[in-house]
């Protein structure tokens, strides 16, 4: 039997463990955070979203990306269900690749106030050109191992 979060004012506001509606837009989406039980330890947490989708703001055509989000938590952890809902809210949102990638990184950084965060947005080609976008909050804390994001360069069929 899975362990349930104890009910408290902090946990009752979470989307985790409850049925919630998909947010209609990134602005409507809520990012939840939970206390970090290892806040005295520097470590890296990684979220990977290999099937992120959004819309081109000009043509309305779908755009696809492989997102990799690495962060060194401070006092808070990013709750993964809320991240999933937030990323899904971009499905009908129109924005350029650079704006999507940087906005996601900034929103997460604001929500959880990590010691460090980076996001890599590896966008699939539109018009024959793949676009990769990278953003981070500052320098990596000393002594923290940051693995490579391991997303190969786009090669097409060649």
Swiss-Prot record:
Q: What class of enzyme is it?
A: oxidoreductase
| UniProt-annotated catalytic positions | 56 (thioimide intermediate), 63 (proton donor)
In terms of Pfam families, this protein maps to: QueF
The places in or outside the cell where this protein is found are: Cytoplasm
A Gene Ontology molecular-function term? preQ1 synthase activity
> Which EC numbers does the record give?
1.7.1.13
Which SUPFAM superfamilies does this one have? Tetrahydrobiopterin biosynthesis enzymes-like
- Keywords, sorted A to Z: Cytoplasm, NADP, Oxidoreductase, Queuosine biosynthesis
What are the GO cellular component annotations? cytoplasm
Q: What NCBIfam families does the database record attribute to this sequence?
A: QueF-II
What family is this?
A: Belongs to the GTP cyclohydrolase I family. QueF type 1 subfamily.
Query: What does the protein in this record do?
Result: Catalyzes the NADPH-dependent reduction of 7-cyano-7-deazaguanine (preQ0) to 7-aminomethyl-7-deazaguanine (preQ1).
- Identification of the protein by name: NADPH-dependent 7-cyano-7-deazaguanine reductase
């Amino acid at each position: 039997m899975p362990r349930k979060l104890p009910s408290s004012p902090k946990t009752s506001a979470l989307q985790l463990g409850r049925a919630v509606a998909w947010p209609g837009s990134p602005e409507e989406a809520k990012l939840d955070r939970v206390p970090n039980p290892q806040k005295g330890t520097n470590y890296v947490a990684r979220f990977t979203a290999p099937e992120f989708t959004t819309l081109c703001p000009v043509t309305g055509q779908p755009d696809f990306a492989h997102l990799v989000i690495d962060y060194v938590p401070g006092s808070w952890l990013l709750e993964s269900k809320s991240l999933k809902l937030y990323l899904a809210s971009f499905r009908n949102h129109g924005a350029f690749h650079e704006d999507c990638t940087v906005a996601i990184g900034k929103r997460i950084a604001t929500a959880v106030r990590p010691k460090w965060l980076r996001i890599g947005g590896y966008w699939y080609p539109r018009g024959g050109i793949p676009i990769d976008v990278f953003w981070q909050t500052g320098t990596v804390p000393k002594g923290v191992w940051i693995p490579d994001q391991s997303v190969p360069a786009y090669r097409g069929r060649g």
